[in-house]
Structures are given as C-alpha cells and as structure tokens.
C-alpha cells in the first residue's frame, strides 16, 4: 500500500487522490482532512503523518513483512527437496560404505595371517640362536681354542708354580711368607706381577742404595 502511495505522490497526484485510494468513495473518513488507520485504530489530523505512519509504523506493514517471510520460508522449503535429492547421490556412497562394512572383517584374516608370522618368527628365534651358538662354537674351534689356550697358558704355568705347597717366596716382590696360604693370597690379590708383570721390584741384593750428599747453606755475615 505504501509503495503505491509513494508512486502516486511521485507522479504528482495530490493527497486527495491518495486518500481516495485508501478509502472507498462515500466513506466518512474521506470527508475529513486527516486520516484514520483502521489496523492501528489511530486518527491523524495531518495526512502526511498518516502517510509516515503507514510507511514506517503501521502494524499492517509488519504483517506484510511476516507474510513475506512466510512466503520466503515456503520457497526455501520448496527448494529444499531438490537439494536433498541432489545430496542423495552423496548419501548413496555412504550407504554403499555402510553396506561394504561387512568387508571390514577383512583385516581380521590379515591379522590372523600376521599372527602365524609372529609365531613363525618365534619359532625361528631358537634356530637363529642355534645358528649363532654353532657359529660361536665353530669360531671357538681350532683358532679360538688356540687363542684361549695361548692366553691362559702363562696363568696356567704361574698357577702350577703357585700350587707348590713348599713355595713361600715371591720373587717379583722379594717377600718371603711364613705360610703357603699367605703366599697364595698375596699372589692372587697383591702381587706386583698381577697388575703389571713387567713392573717387578728389584732384588735387595742387586739394588744399591746411593746416599745423596748433604748440602749446607752458607750464611752471610752481617759485618764484613
């Protein structure tokens, strides 16, 4: 209604023509200079105020806006089903994925297949250990055994000498013990040949003690 009034005002029609457009001819409201809004039950003395009310504040305008909103919502709902139909192809892959869900147990056979592999690895571990043991035993055969025998031969000879129950003298340290047991303990833990065989103490008879000359300090005389 307000748009029609504005269009007529722009075309140059007077307020009387606008008033006649709002009210049918012969109505009592058309006689008065003012105007009455029947939707809001308000009477205006100035027709311009009535136009402003109709344009901005009338409840019929809000009702028209609500009806327009309802129409827009109806259009949106009418347009919504095609969207749902358009989205249905996207939903179909989901349904296909859901239908393909029974194929999810496929990893289970893979898992079961992996379990025998783990068992096989566990079975192979003793074989690997046996192989390593056999290789180590082969390494310890002729060459390794000779190396070990060669490394233990000096200690074996020393132990053979230490096993003599009459031996109580340590040549490396030049110490004689009263008991053979003390000699054995000395050779096992404290002997210098055990730490460094080359570092043997010199015999007392061969080593000669050379005393150093004593140096005397000369005092300066205070009175010269």
From Swiss-Prot:
A GO molecular-function annotation: DNA binding
Biased composition (Basic and acidic residues): 117-128
Keyword Transport: no
Span of zinc fingers (CCHC FOG-type): 29-62, 162-195
Pfam families assigned to the protein according to its UniProt record, in alphabetical order: CCHC_ZFPM2 (PF25445)
Biased composition (Basic residues): 215-224
Residues that bind Zn(2+) 1: 37, 40, 53, 58
GO cellular component, one term: nucleus
Disordered: annotated span: 1-24, 81-165, 196-224
Distribution of this protein across tissues and organs: Expressed at the lateral plate mesoderm.
Main localization (coarse): nucleus
Coiled coil: none
Feature: compositional bias, Low complexity: 81-103, 148-158
Binding-site positions, Zn(2+) 2: 170, 173, 186, 191
GO terms for biological process, alphabetical: heart development; heart looping; hemopoiesis; regulation of transcription by RNA polymerase II
Electron transport keyword on record: no
Subcellular location: Nucleus
Keyword list, A-Z: Activator, DNA-binding, Metal-binding, Nucleus, Repeat, Repressor, Transcription, Transcription regulation, Zinc, Zinc-finger
Physiological role: Transcription regulator that modulates expression mediated by transcription factors of the GATA family. Cofactor that acts via the formation of a heterodimer with transcription factors of the GATA family. Such heterodimer can both activate or repress transcriptional activity, depending on the cell and promoter context.
Quaternary structure and partners: Interacts with the N-terminal zinc finger of gata1.
Domain note: The CCHC FOG-type zinc fingers probably directly bind to GATA-type zinc fingers. The Tyr residue adjacent to the last Cys of the CCHC FOG-type zinc finger is probably essential for the interaction with GATA-type zinc fingers.
Family: Belongs to the FOG (Friend of GATA) family.
Protein name listed in UniProt: Zinc finger protein ZFPM1
Source organism (scientific name): Danio rerio (Zebrafish)
């Amino acid at each position: 209604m307000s748009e029609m009034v504005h269009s007529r005002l722009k075309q140059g029609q007077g307020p009387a023509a606008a008033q006649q457009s709002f009210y049918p001819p012969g109505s009592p409201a058309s006689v008065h200079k003012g105007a009455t809004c029947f939707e809001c039950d308000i009477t205006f003395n100035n027709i311009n105020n009535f136009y402003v009310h109709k344009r901005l504040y009338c409840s019929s305008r809000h009702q028209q806006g609500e009806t327009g909103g309802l129409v827009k919502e109806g259009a949106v709902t009418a347009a919504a089903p095609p969207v749902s139909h358009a989205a249905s192809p996207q939903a179909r892959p989901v349904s296909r994925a859901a239908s393909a869900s029974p194929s999810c147990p496929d990893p289970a056979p893979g898992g079961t297949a992996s379990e025998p592999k783990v068992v096989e690895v566990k079975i192979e571990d003793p074989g690997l250990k046996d192989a390593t043991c056999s290789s180590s035993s082969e390494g310890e055969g002729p060459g390794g055994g000779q190396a070990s025998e060669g490394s233990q031969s000096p200690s074996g000879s020393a132990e053979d000498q230490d096993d003599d129950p009459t031996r109580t003298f340590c040549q490396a340290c030049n110490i004689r013990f009263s008991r053979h047991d003390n000699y054995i303990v000395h050779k096992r833990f404290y002997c210098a040949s055990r730490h460094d065989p080359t570092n043997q103490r010199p015999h007392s008879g061969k080593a000669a003690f050379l005393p150093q000359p004593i140096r005397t300090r000369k005092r300066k005389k205070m009175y010269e």
